[in-house]
Amino acid sequence: MNGFKAVRVPVSALSGEPLPDVFGTKGDCLVAFEVKAPKAERAYSPREQVEKLFLFLNFFEPFSQKKAVLGAKFPRKWVFRMVEKPDDFVVSREEQSSYHLETQ
């Protein structure tokens, strides 16, 4: 992850805990990822799941940069979208990533 220290959180079932699928740190930056692997052309992330990313990020006060990112793994393509607030989101296979680790 481009100099990031990262951890995959192995939670296979829906959990009441605000745990992301993956999180990574680099310096004063913390990034939390919710990842989907849809069979269709779109990945849906309901508001409740996105809200958990922000709850997780808020646990860590020392980090001045906190980012919530939705990831979708389509056949032969990944799309990453940074989100600013909890809401319902759809990530399409056709869109370009709005988040890139290289810019960190």
Identify what each model region corresponds to.
Residues M1-A13, T25, P62:
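Acidic-basic catalytic patches of nuclease active cores, encompassing PD-(D/E)XK
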Residues R8, E34, L70-A72:
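Structural signal for conserved beta-strand scaffold positions within catalytic alpha/beta enzyme cores
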Residues A13, K39, D87:
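Residue-level detector of flexible, active-site-proximal loop/helix-junction positions
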Residues S15, V31, E41, K77-W78:
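Flexible, glycine-rich phosphate/dinucleotide-binding loops
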Residues P18:
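Beta-rich catalytic cores
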Residues V22-G24, D28-K39:
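Conserved catalytic cores of phosphodiester-cleaving nucleases, focusing on short active-site segments
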Residues P38-L70:
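Short, charged, amphipathic alpha-helix that recurs within catalytic cores of restriction-modification
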Residues P62-Q104:
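Domain-level recognition of nuclease-like catalytic cores that cleave nucleotide substrates
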